[in-house]
Amino acid sequence: MRICRKIAALGLCAVLLVSLMPIVFAADAAPALQFDENGEFKILIVADTQDIDKPQKETIALLEAELDAAQPDLVVFLGDQIHGPSTGKSVERTQKALDAILQPIAERSLQFAVVFGNHDDEGGVSKETQMEY
């Protein structure tokens, strides 16, 4: 009976180690988020940009100004990055809308996180597809 328990415990340990492998390798993909030398970590919250494939210049200009002023370590989008119905259920138009919003982030090599809102998939492009993009 003890041998069976030991074998089962070893098997569970092996499964646990294998299941943690993707997390370990994913951690190498992006730089670690960490506090700076002053113990600070700045997060810029961006909510409800609701942009379309023809980006609103004012929205992009405001985002760029805030990024430059705040110098964040992380940008968090709180949903409704795009106005789904305005993209016409088109993957291409959805990608253009996302490009417009994410370009200022990419230009500054900032890390970001996304929370989806109700408008993000109303255009017929799933949240899963948007995450892959």
Which residues are covered by each model-predicted region?
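Short, solvent-exposed loop/turn elements at domain surfaces
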Residues: 51-55
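Core catalytic region of metal-dependent phosphoesterases/phosphodiesterases
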Residues: 57-133
